Amino acid sequence: MIRLLFLLLSFYISSQTDQNSKEHTLVLEIPNIETAGIIYIAVYDNAEDFDSGDDSREIMAYNIIEPVSKEIYQKKIILKEGDYAVKVLIDTNNNGDIDLNFFGLPKEQFGFSNNVLGLFGAPKFDKASFKLNENKKIIIKLR
């Protein structure tokens, strides 16, 4: 009897673990790249890291850095089920920085998931986040 209970408990725990680690395909599409450069995509899975302003790769759930041309950009990535928010920057002069104009606004194209903007800077996670609980495609329009 104890063996049967142990076996049932083990099966239940393993089935819960499988449900919590479901993976889905996220397709990121960026349709309006105006100038070729290096694309920086940062995917975050929590508000603390997204809202921190810290762009170190260690705190990102996923990141992409690669050359991009003036075409529609699409990338498929596999992520665990959960809530995510995405930041995108096109570095057109390849200096690794967000270049700002006199008013402190970015000179280079940028965007966020849900196509939201913050009032004075990046939007908060709760505005930019989306739930990934099935395969999904999101379109981020750059500004």
Residue ranges and their predicted role:
Residues Q16-A47, G53-D55, L100-R143:
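Primarily secretory-pathway and cell-envelope proteins
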Residues T35, K80-G82:
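Surface-exposed loops/turns
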Residues V43, L89-D91:
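Hydrophobic beta-strand positions
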Residues D54-I78:
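Tryptophan-paired
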Residues D91-D99:
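Acidic, glycine-anchored loop motifs typical of Ca2+
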